[in-house]
Structure formats: structure tokens, C-alpha cells
From Swiss-Prot:
This is Lymphatic vessel endothelial hyaluronic acid receptor 1. The chain crosses the membrane at residues 239-259. The gene is LYVE1. Residues 17-238 are extracellular. InterPro entries: C-type_lectin-like/link_sf (IPR016186), CD44_antigen-like (IPR043210), CTDL_fold (IPR016187), Link_dom (IPR000538). Homodimer; disulfide-linked. Interacts with PDGFB and IGFBP3. Forms a transient ternary complex with PDGFB and PDGFRB in TGN. Disulfide bonds join C61-C128, C85-C106. Residues 40-130 form the Link domain. It comes from Bos taurus (Bovine). Residues 279-309 have a biased composition (Basic and acidic residues). One of its GO terms (cellular component) is plasma membrane. The lineage of its organism: Eukaryota, Metazoa, Chordata, Craniata, Vertebrata. It is found in: Membrane. Ligand-specific transporter trafficking between intracellular organelles (TGN) and the plasma membrane. Plays a role in autocrine regulation of cell growth mediated by growth regulators containing cell surface retention sequence binding (CRS). May act as a hyaluronan (HA) transporter, either mediating its uptake for catabolism within lymphatic endothelial cells themselves, or its transport into the lumen of afferent lymphatic vessels for subsequent re-uptake and degradation in lymph nodes.
Amino acid sequence: MAKFFSLGLLLASIWTTRLLVQGSLRSEEISILGPCRIMGVTLVTKKTQPLLNFTEAQEACRLVGLTLASQDQVEEARKFGFETCSYGWVKNQFVVIPRIISNPKCGKSGVGVVIWRSSLSSRHRSYCHNSSDIWINSCLPEIITTDDPLFNTETATYTTKLMVSDSTHSELSTDGPDYVTTTVAPPLASTSTPRKRKLICITEAFMDTSAVATERESDIQNRPAFKNEAVGFGGVPTALLVLALLFFAAAAGLAVCYVKRYVKAFPFTNKNQQKEMIETKVVKEEKADDSNPNEESKKMNKTPEEPKSPPKTTVRCLEAEV
């Protein structure tokens, strides 16, 4: 019961004090020193003496639409140039003077927020704060910058996106979009169409000599590589296939020219020449040796000269896809 009685008495005293303060302070008596607020902080005083105690300082700030500032808020304002030469109440229940330059007449030559602890009934001015200020100086349109990690991250992200967009736009034409969408086309399926194969054979006749044998060996060695090249034409374009056919035609023409040039090497021509030579020789011997029939018969009985071994033929085949 005693606790409830003491609590009611306390509330009644506070209410009575508030009524007394409200009755003693009027908004016409309150004056704001300076038209501008720094970081929302300004100095409020009373036009007439005496000045304000701690309770009256709170009420004075309320009458001008502000709240009693704290020591930290006054320190923040001092960093941006807020400086006075008057002690004033703060929320921490002591009086302070914000100083930037040392002055023996202001705060005993102190620098910073000079603190003086005095009784709550002592008379001083008050430092009030406006929490809705977004400018460093309320008289200048300069936005307050804060060290917010989230704000810094968003700013960095925006800058990065802007740089990427600018570099992309510089690479594109003036009529193109601001963003590039890269699409990867699927690889085309390789379609293989059946091709006809044509076999070209060239027959060449040579006498059985060492030179011909050497050439035949070189042809045998080069033939597999040539066939491999022909087989590899399966996937080449039409232009390369046409070039290959022209190459084969040129080879055939060279072979024909070679045969015409060395036509004496054919066996049929050699046999005709051998017959003509034998007949001429027989006629000469008959005219010269009519008186000697025995010798003529011996000569006639002689076996004709054996012809050379029949020539060997080689076949050269070329396989190409058409």
C-alpha cells in the first residue's frame, strides 16, 4: 500500500512541476540563436532572465518543435563546424560547450565538447536537435552522407553495372540495344550423302628393262598413298572434288602423251621392223650368193633371231568419288 502511495505522489509531483513549467514558459519567451542548424543541432535560450534549468531546457526545446540534444549529437555537429561560446544543457544532464578553436573566454581554452557538471537547478541555455534534418547545414541544400555499409555496397554495385552497360554500348552500334544477349546456335548435324565412285585405269606397256622395273617399284610405293587421298574425299566440298577430277584428267593426258612419245617401245612396231629387216637381208644374200647355194641354204636354214621377251604391262588405277 505504501508503494502505491509513493508512486502516486511521484506522478502528482511530476504533473504539478510540468504544469508549473508550462505556466512559467511561453513560446514568445524562447529564442533560437542563429537561423541555421548544423547536423540538426542549434542553441536555444530565453529572452529574459533568468535562463533555463534542466527541466525548463527540455520544455523549451519542445516548444520550438525540437528535442533536447545529446552529447554525441553535439559532437557530430562540432565536426561540421558547429561552435559556440555558451554552456547549454544536453540530454546527459550536464552542460557542454562545443569548441573548435581554443579560446580562454570560452570553456577555459578547451577544444572539443567541453563538459561542465553542475546541479540540475543551475541556469543555462539548451542545445536542441531536429531529427528530421537531412542536410549538414539547414540553410544550404547539402545532403548528409553516412557511412552505411549497405549503402556503399549498393553504390558499388550500381557503378559496376553502369560501367558494364557503357562498355557494351560502345561496342554496339548506335541503333542497337543497351544489353547484349549472346545465343549459341546448336551445331549443324553433319549429313552424309552417298557418292558414286569412279575407277579410272591407265594401261602402260614397257619393255623389261631395269629402268622400267625401277619406275614400277616407285609406282607401287606411291599407289597406297594416292588411294588414301582418294578415299579421303568423302567429306570435302564440291570445289575440291572438281579439282581432284581435273588432276586425274591431267594425269590421264600426261599418260597418253607419254605413250605417244615413246611409241617405238610398243611390241607390235618392233615386230614389223624386225620382219622388214629380215626380208631385206634375205634378198641381199640371194643376190650376192647365187653361186653358192649351199651357203644360201645354210643361211636360210638358220633360225631367225629370237625376239625379245614380251613386254610387261602395268595397270594404274585411280579411284575417285563423284
